[in-house]
Amino acid sequence: EYAYQLYYIKNAEKYYNGEATADELGINVIDDYTLEVTLEAPTTYFPQLLAFPTYAPLREDIVSADPEGWATKPETYVTNGAFKLVRWDMKDQLVFEKNEN
């Protein structure tokens, strides 16, 4: 359970506990490439927190289509870097190739 890592974001803990809506979260989509995050309080180490996979932005359509398996299948695993996952042998190896996008 890694939800607590997101509690620095405004209303994230309340959202997790069913006390706030998604619209009340301190996350605003500016455009296809930009998110604006509002924090509960100044958090000087927030940039370091962004290195955790918990903070990776995800496409809702991918997660909703396969809530239990999207993160373990190369065809649905979402990446946003220089490489994409092409094979995942659980507890053995991950194989990546250059992301042409």
Residue ranges and their predicted role:
Residues A12-E24, I30-Y33, L39-N101:
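Gly/Pro-rich hinge or "lid" segments in bacterial periplasmic/extracellular proteins
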Residues E1-Q5, E36:
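Aromatic- and charge-enriched surface segment that lines or borders ligand/interaction sites
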